[in-house]
Design a protein with these regions (language model features):
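Pyridoxal 5′-phosphate
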Residues: 2-411
Length: 411
């Protein structure tokens, strides 16, 4: 969608821009300059006391989306049960259709959830497990998902196969082969991260899915960090299930996620919650969670508008540029350990860095106490360092300050 089409299709609810002080078309024309990103930064109410390089847990909401959220809260509160009974589902369907265009799949295969954890749990707990079935996952997968698999394995008497994803693979084939060699006759499901949350490495999901399907194995993709981060289409991945959190890189309000279920699995999966027992129902039967903040769901539409205004590719390029700004000069420093690949197709914003002789928690503390840089320490098998996660509001000077801090600490 080009900028003219976008401006024409903006929903009224989203035109609460702090950019109202700007002329939007002229503002977008500055997209190739730092002026553009400074105006994006102005759309965020940032704490001036420290540099925030931890956008991986939760993306701060820009003012336009936040203003829209406040309006939606007022609307729902004003209408009360009238909204919940008469309008909630209609608006949810509208948001779902809009979102499906962004993620690249049919709205018939997509539901809104509260986060990736809920999405992946719906699949892991909803499959028809048989004693002896096998699940494959990696040490680098999200910790809570590993625990859920262990719990499910204990409950249904399943086996698990755990592998290690290399931080610096030679090529896609090395990754695909790793998963392929782990498959046995009893393997039913592979859980795989689209982007490894602790290193930022992007895995070749389509190739893994195609390979797994040759063995009759289903693939559940953890895409927590992917929607709104870099461009791809869920349909093109050829996966069976895909979960993501929209309060991360799409910058929707907290408690917004998605679950994609390939249509061929709609009747085979049991929902976590249910309003009825009709297994002939479509994707909607997986979306019932009881009463929850409906205004968060409506605000997803405003988050999409802001994302499209930024430009999907423009945002991805900017995030990768910020990554390169600090990682490339440090790649050959023998005291600094980068746990993220050097191939641009394998990363975007997120990277992980360690310094020899310093624990991840020590490095994180030094960065915050001495340099006022906030990040998160990661101490996991094969990955010991700090996860660095800039955002669209991060400017060049902040990245350079961080880079210089690492060099000073390493020296």
């Amino acid at each position: 969608m080009d900028k003219r089409d976008f401006i024409k299709t903006l929903t009224l609810g989203s035109i609460s821009w702090s950019i109202s002080s700007h002329d939007i078309p002229n503002w977008l024309n500055e997209s190739d300059s730092e002026k553009f990103w400074q105006k994006v930064r102005d759309d965020y109410n940032l704490v001036p006391d420290y540099i925030n390089l931890e956008s991986g847990y939760y993306n701060i909401i820009p003012k336009p989306t936040l203003n829209a959220l406040h309006n939606h809260i007022d609307k729902v509160n004003r209408l009360g049960s009238m909204y919940m009974r008469k309008f909630k589902e209609k608006e949810k369907v509208s948001v779902n259709k809009k979102l499906s265009q962004i993620v690249g799949c049919s709205s018939k295969n997509l539901i809104l959830t509260r986060n990736t954890t809920e999405s992946l749990n719906t699949v892991i707990k909803g499959l028809n497990w048989v004693e002896g079935d096998n699940i494959i996952f990696a040490n680098q997968d999200y910790g809570a998902m590993q625990q859920m698999i262990h719990q499910t394995a204990e409950r249904f008497k399943l086996s698990t196969t755990i592998l290690d994803v290399p931080n610096h693979p030679k090529d896609d084939d090395e990754i695909v082969s790793l998963y392929e060699k782990s498959i046995s006759k009893s393997t039913k499901l592979i859980l795989v991260s689209h982007m490894v949350n602790i290193t930022g490495q992007i895995l070749p999901i389509k190739k893994i899915c195609n390979m797994a399907h040759n063995y009759g194995v289903q693939v559940l993709v953890d895409g927590a960090h992917c929607i709104g981060h870099f461009t791809f289409s869920i349909d093109e991945l050829n996966c069976d299930y895909y979960g993501s959190s929209l309060h991360k890189w799409l910058a929707a309000p907290l408690g917004c996620g998605i679950l994609y279920i390939n249509e061929k699995h709609h009747k085979d999966l049991w929902p976590l919650f249910t309003r009825n027992s009709n297994l002939e129902d479509g994707i909607e039967r997986f979306g019932h969670t009881g009463t929850h903040p409906a205004y968060h769901d409506i605000s997803i539409s405003n988050a999409i508008d802001y994302y499209v205004m930024l430009g999907q590719k423009r945002k991805e390029d900017r995030l990768r540029y910020l990554n390169n700004l600090w990682t490339k000069p440090l790649r050959n420093n023998n005291k600094i350990i980068l746990n993220t690949p050097n191939n641009p197709k394998r990363y975007a914003a997120i990277a992980n860095v360690g310094i020899k002789g310093i624990s991840p928690s020590e490095l994180s503390n030094i960065l915050f106490e001495k340099y006022k840089i906030f990040c998160v320490a990661i101490d996991r098998p094969g990955v010991r360092g700090c996860r660095i996660t800039p955002n669209v509001f991060t400017n060049e000077n902040e990245i350079i300050s961080f880079r210089n801090a690492l060099l000073e600490i390493a020296s």
